[in-house]
């Protein structure tokens, strides 16, 4: 009976020692998310970060790194969206000038084109504010990280 108990304890110790560190298991997913951002595949990067959260709840170091990296993903995505909105606005501005050339200010076509241009300008400004927001958020996290020495 004593031998069985000792054998059971030894088996439990061996089984508990063989568990892998969750941080080392989750690290490849974070690296894959980084590669997805380099390739401008933001949906895949977000999905990988979400899978780290759900599949490795005990991998605290990698989860913190993923949390910080998600801000970087959002920042890069916002920069792309801002560039797109800016180019659409510039095209709309040229179109507005072309359509309204020679028409009086009170003409319905001018008014409609002006409203369209205003909505494009608002979208461009919204995207630029989004870029600034994520840039400030990343800068604040870096300041906090330097002060505390933590992730």
Predicted regions and their residues:
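Short solvent-exposed coil/turn linkers within tandem alpha-helical repeat scaffolds
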Residues: 53-64, 96-111, 115
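C-terminal motif of bacterial Sec signal peptides marking the signal peptidase cleavage site
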Residues: 13-16
């Amino acid at each position: 009976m004593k031998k069985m108990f000792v054998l059971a304890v030894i088996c439990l110790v061996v089984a508990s020692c063989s568990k892998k560190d969750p941080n080392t298991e989750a690290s490849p997913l974070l690296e894959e998310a980084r590669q997805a951002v380099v390739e401008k595949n933001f949906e895949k990067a977000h999905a990988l970060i979400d899978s780290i959260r759900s599949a490795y709840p005990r991998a605290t170091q990698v989860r913190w790194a993923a949390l910080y990296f998600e801000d970087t993903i959002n920042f890069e995505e916002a920069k792309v969206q801002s560039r797109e909105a800016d180019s659409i606005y510039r095209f709309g501005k040229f179109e507005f000038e072309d359509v309204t050339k020679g028409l009086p200010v009170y003409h319905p076509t001018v008014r409609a084109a002006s409203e369209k241009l205003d909505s494009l300008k608002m979208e461009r400004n919204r995207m630029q504010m989004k870029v600034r927001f994520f840039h400030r958020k990343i800068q604040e996290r870096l300041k906090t990280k330097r002060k505390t020495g933590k992730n």
